[in-house]
């Protein structure tokens, strides 16, 4: 157990360093505020990763950091476009870090991706939603080739919680 915990600590630190590098690169252009846009819904276990992370971050972050998308106020397919418009109005020069659950290959379940560039929410369930973000973070919650949205309801909560803890701890370390 201690060895596994030590390994996770290294993962958190590595992810935190990568995120910090990306944000510092963008801050060099004069952008100071950071907005974490955590996408998903509390009505589907597999799609709850974003709001879980948002709730964890909202309790921890301060200063020039804003969190949008929590369990209490989720950002999902229905309100995503309106939320993006509001972000552009209130935080026009912010660095947007978009966070969402993803589905992928079964052997990738539990992995986290961190990329420079926008997130394309809904791809795993064949929805065409607006791409958003300067940096994207996804946690692969399940493996699915079918694109069946009902699949997300059968994903184990423990898997989603582990990813939420990993991602939120990494962000808080950064």
Question: What are the language-model segments listed below?
Answer:
Residues 1-8, 12:
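Single conserved hydrophobic/aromatic residue that forms the stacking wall/gate
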Residues 27-29, 60-61, 88-91, 105-106, ...:
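Solvent-exposed alpha-helices and their adjacent loops that cap or buttress functional pockets
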């Amino acid at each position: 157990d201690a060895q596994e915990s030590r390994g996770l600590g290294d993962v958190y630190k590595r992810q935190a360093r990568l995120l910090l590098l990306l944000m510092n690169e963008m801050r060099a252009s004069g952008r100071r505020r950071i907005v974490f846009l955590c996408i998903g819904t509390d009505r589907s276990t597999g799609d709850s990763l974003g709001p879980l992370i948002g709730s964890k971050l909202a309790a921890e972050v301060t200063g020039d950091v804003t969190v949008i998308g929590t369990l209490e106020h989720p950002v999902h397919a229905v309100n995503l476009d309106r939320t993006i418009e509001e972000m552009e109005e209130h935080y026009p020069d912010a660095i947007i870090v978009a966070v969402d659950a993803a589905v992928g290959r079964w052997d990738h379940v539990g992995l986290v991706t961190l990329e420079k560039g926008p997130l394309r929410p809904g791809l795993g369930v064949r929805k065409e939603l607006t791409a958003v973000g300067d940096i994207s973070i996804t946690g692969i919650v399940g493996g699915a080739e079918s694109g069946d949205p009902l699949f997300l309801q059968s994903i184990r909560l423990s898997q989603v919680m582990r990813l939420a803890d990993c991602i939120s701890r990494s962000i808080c370390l950064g």
